[in-house]
Amino acid sequence: MLHTLSVSPWHADIAAMLRVMDHGDDLLLLSDGVTAAIAGGRFLEILQSAPITLYVLQDDVDARGLAGQIADSVGRVSYTDFVRLTVKHAGQLAW
């Protein structure tokens, strides 16, 4: 399953999101959701404990001036990569 988080993690039910995530799922952080990938942040630690792969949309990171603050452990993807993730997964759940 591809999960997308497009709101600030402070405005999302992260606990509920984690409950429905399964091994092998991907989470793509978009729009204000990219703030969840800030190095040393509370939400990054929580998300990295899940059995998922974590990505950020690079254009949204750049638009927010966060390029130097995103953790190196988080994959950075383009819109083309976003399409590839969509094709990879049979379903998508937006948060």
UniProtKB/Swiss-Prot annotation:
<dbReference type="Pfam" id="PF04077">
    <property type="entry name" value="DsrH"/>
</dbReference>
<comment type="subunit">
    <text>Heterohexamer, formed by a dimer of trimers. The hexameric TusBCD complex contains 2 copies each of TusB, TusC and TusD. The TusBCD complex interacts with TusE.</text>
</comment>
<comment type="function">
    <text>Part of a sulfur-relay system required for 2-thiolation of 5-methylaminomethyl-2-thiouridine (mnm(5)s(2)U) at tRNA wobble positions.</text>
</comment>
<keyword id="KW-0963">Cytoplasm</keyword>
<keyword id="KW-0819">tRNA processing</keyword>
<comment type="similarity">
    <text>Belongs to the DsrH/TusB family.</text>
</comment>
<dbReference type="GO" id="GO:1990228">
    <property type="term" value="C:sulfurtransferase complex"/>
</dbReference>
<dbReference type="GO" id="GO:0002143">
    <property type="term" value="P:tRNA wobble position uridine thiolation"/>
</dbReference>
<dbReference type="InterPro" id="IPR027396">
    <property type="entry name" value="DsrEFH-like"/>
</dbReference>
<protein>
    <recommendedName>
        <fullName>Protein TusB</fullName>
    </recommendedName>
</protein>
<dbReference type="InterPro" id="IPR023526">
    <property type="entry name" value="Sulphur_relay_TusB"/>
</dbReference>
<dbReference type="InterPro" id="IPR007215">
    <property type="entry name" value="Sulphur_relay_TusB/DsrH"/>
</dbReference>
